Amino acid sequence: MAKEKPHINIVFIGHVDHGKSTTIGRLLFDTANIPENIIKKFEEMGEKGKSFKFAWVMDRLKEERERGITIDVAHTKFETPHRYITIIDAPGHRDFVKNMITGASQADAAVLVVAVTDGVMPQTKEHAFLARTLGINNILVAVNKMDMVNYDEKKFKAVAEQVKKLLMMLGYKNFPIIPISAWEGDNVVKKSDKMPWYNGPTLIEALDQMPEPPKPTDKPLRIPIQDVYSIKGVGTVPVGRVETGVLRVGDVVIFEPASTIFHKPIQGEVKSIEMHHEPMQEALPGDNIGFNVRGVGKNDIKRGDVAGHTNNPPTVVRPKDTFKAQIIVLNHPTAITVGYTPVLHAHTLQVAVRFEQLLAKLDPRTGNIVEENPQFIKTGDSAIVVLRPTKPMVIEPVKEIPQMGRFAIRDMGQTVAAGMVISIQKAE
């Protein structure tokens, strides 16, 4: 069987109104991922329908966004010669950060859209910094609205230089910077004849050359549980996405924090594994699976539990333990002080955590300490903090298992901060 094309999850980031949605719309439109019947309608209108058609697509996308849902996920897959690409979310959506951290869709790469008319804006910086914090290692830049400056090379170069500085400071290397006009369709899918001075790839060509994300098969097995079903004739079937490691039929797995909470090992042998209703012998990172474990009942485990091998079980942080984390405060109405107890979201879990200590405030750009033991931290600050969970939960240091070490902090219906676990302090 021929090797299937790799799947890549892309997230679009950038300042509000710089053209993220238009760029997505143009990609889908020019790769013919807009429903056939709609295209037909406009073709019947002849010339008049042409410019109209793209505007209509954009309106549809906008309408869906205003109803509080991002672009209908069914339409956000498209294919390039060497990749299947899924657009997993477009920011501006209030749960964007939470979705990126807890979603089954960790982004492999980001497209940073910057309008040539504005250059780097506050949100451009914030999104780029966030992409770094969330572990997105590949980024490409689309300098949009080139039609508004008559496709001027000088203006492009000036903005490209700003973006380059920002991204290099954050530790990004080797990122293409592409001049585009999403509205006119220049250099998104079709090569532009209006910028003869540019000889690099179009946006879709650059996406097609994205490095394939490595599968972390060498890391310990971790499967955060999304749901637990009881299936007649089979038994209890936990469902989740393999984040790291490999699960094989016959393996013995243990569930945490269930085992810690019940004071007995909730574990058993894996009798069967299924993906998309097909039985399989082994599951790899990225696979969304259901699996049946001998001797584990429906009431033993729930969403937020994590399965791992018994010889390398998931790490549990209990209320008597703490963990040290680096966070970036995205949105807090006043200030965060010791004692603040919001809800932490990571993989499939949600647990209230208490801020025990504010160790240091960092310069978000360099990571250097600017203040030790600050009294408070506020929106825009990056900090090292000590957190204590109010009940047992599974989380791992980002250096050991990055896929299990990132989290969002939420309160009052919004994402207050994003962060990553530096180390875990167990109380003996």
Curated annotation (Swiss-Prot):
Gene3D superfamilies: P-loop containing nucleotide triphosphate hydrolases, Translation factors. Residues 5-215 form the tr-type G domain. Residues 181-183 are annotated as: G5. Residues 68-72 are annotated as: G2. HAMAP family: EF_Tu_A. Belongs to the TRAFAC class translation factor GTPase superfamily. Classic translation factor GTPase family. EF-Tu/EF-1A subfamily. This is Elongation factor 1-alpha. The lineage of its organism: Archaea, Methanobacteriati, Methanobacteriota, Thermococci, Thermococcales. The gene is tuf.
